[in-house]
């Protein structure tokens, strides 16, 4: 039996970054994107999901199946400066919102 198992990795604890965190709004901690389960102020210890399908704000002409990144909590095209890879859209963008698969 493996003795080095830590967890399933589906959730991770993190410290809320500058500006805090809002439940359901993607947060990038270096290259790790998390979806916070609850909100908190800068410095608060929180828990976020590392995968799953999420409905979040989006910007640009994004289409289902397209790779997307996240910048300041909003899905953007992968080539957007200072963005972090998020995953792939599972819906077209409608009214600046899209459903996307968070792929670690």
What would you call each of these model-derived segments?
Residues 1-104:
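Surface-exposed, low-hydrophobicity beta-strand/loop segments enriched in small/polar/acidic residues
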């Amino acid at each position: 039996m493996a003795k080095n198992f830590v967890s399933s990795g589906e959730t991770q604890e993190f410290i809320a970054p500058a500006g805090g965190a809002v439940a359901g709004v993607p947060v990038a901690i270096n290259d790790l994107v998390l979806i916070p389960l609850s909100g908190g102020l800068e410095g608060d210890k929180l828990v976020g999901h590392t995968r799953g399908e999420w409905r979040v704000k989006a910007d640009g002409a994004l289409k289902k199946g397209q790779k997307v990144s996240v910048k300041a909590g909003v899905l953007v095209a992968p080539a957007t400066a200072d963005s972090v890879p998020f995953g792939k859209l599972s819906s077209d963008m409608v009214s600046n919102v899209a459903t996307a698969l968070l792929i670690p």
